């Protein structure tokens, strides 16, 4: 099973919860990136790994002509509900189904690190961007600045050891690593910045439900069962409880803007 096929299978069962409970929390970094690359009326934008289309919806409200690609059919169905006029394709980040130089801007929000061939993905993002167009890649910031690392660790603790070279969600978070990859793919790094993005849940049930909808959690469920996965997530959230009963995890995300 290829990477795209596997990711599509894992993210499908929780697509509705992920798109409705998690994606709205990402507005701070969606908007920061769209501001940085000047998304405006008429911008031909590709979001690679678009999920349920929340970012595409925001870009469309700015007047952009939006295109999205994702491996997960159920997430794309939700994206179609949100952005009926978008051009949405199911496919693989490592082999984008688009001609060369199609887009004025390309974004990838926390998606490329799930691919098996990172260099191939970056090369594809460059290929479909018009010469000189911005390619914006957003990833987790340094693990020590991301409280949600405890959630990722809890899920990882239920899984068998990853294959050699599989570095997980923080695969590109080390200083300079994303820039180095971009340069190898023929992109020209222009600027990088960080966006604080807290994840806030009204109660523990919502917090656990949100994380259970992710692809990595689905993999943990397949290996360890849902009760064990729920228990591990609840324990990981324990020290994020706020006085009002809500749960908050402060995180920093980092984005790079490079030119094709």
Question: Which residues does each PLM region occupy?
Answer:
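Conserved Class I S-adenosyl-L-methionine
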Residues: 6-7, 25-26, 52-54, 171-260
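Conserved catalytic/acceptor-binding region of the Class I
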Residues: 119, 126, 132-202, 218-219, ...
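Class I SAM-dependent methyltransferase SAM/SAH-binding core
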Residues: 44-96, 120
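A short acidic, Gly/Pro-enriched loop at the edge of an enzyme's catalytic core
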Residues: 94-105
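Conserved class I S-adenosyl-L-methionine
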Residues: 1-43, 54-58, 74-78, 82, ...
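A short SAM/SAH-binding and catalytic strip from SAM-dependent methyltransferases
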Residues: 104-119, 141
């Amino acid at each position: 099973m290829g990477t795209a096929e596997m990711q599509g299978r894992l993210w499908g069962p929780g697509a509705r919860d992920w798109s409705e409970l998690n994606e709205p929390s990402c507005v701070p970094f969606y908007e920061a990136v769209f501001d940085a690359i000047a998304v405006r009326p008429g911008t031909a934008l590709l979001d690679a790994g678009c999920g349920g289309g929340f970012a595409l919806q925001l870009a469309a409200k700015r007047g952009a002509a939006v295109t999205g690609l994702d491996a997960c059919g159920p997430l794309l169905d939700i994206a179609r509900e949100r952005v009926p006029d978008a051009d949405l394709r199911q496919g693989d980040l490592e082999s984008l189904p688009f001609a060369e130089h199609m887009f004025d801007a390309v974004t990838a929000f926390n998606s490329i690190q799930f691919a098996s061939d990172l260099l191939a993905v970056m090369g594809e993002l460059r290929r479909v961007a018009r010469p000189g167009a911005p390619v914006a890649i957003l990833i987790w910031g340094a693990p020590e600045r991301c409280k949600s690392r405890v959630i990722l660790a809890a899920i990882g603790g239920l899984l068998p050891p990853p294959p050699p070279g599989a570095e997980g969600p923080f695969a590109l978070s080390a200083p300079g690593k994303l820039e180095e990859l971009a340069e190898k793919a023929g992109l020209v790094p222009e600027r990088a910045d960080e966006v604080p993005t807290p994840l806030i849940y009204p109660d523990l049930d919502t917090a656990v439900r949100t994380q259970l909808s992710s692809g990595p959690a689905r993999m943990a469920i397949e290996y360890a069962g849902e009760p064990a996965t729920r228990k591990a997530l609840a324990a990981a959230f324990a020290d994020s409880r706020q006085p009002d009963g809500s749960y908050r995890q402060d995180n920093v995300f980092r984005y790079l803007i490079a030119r094709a």
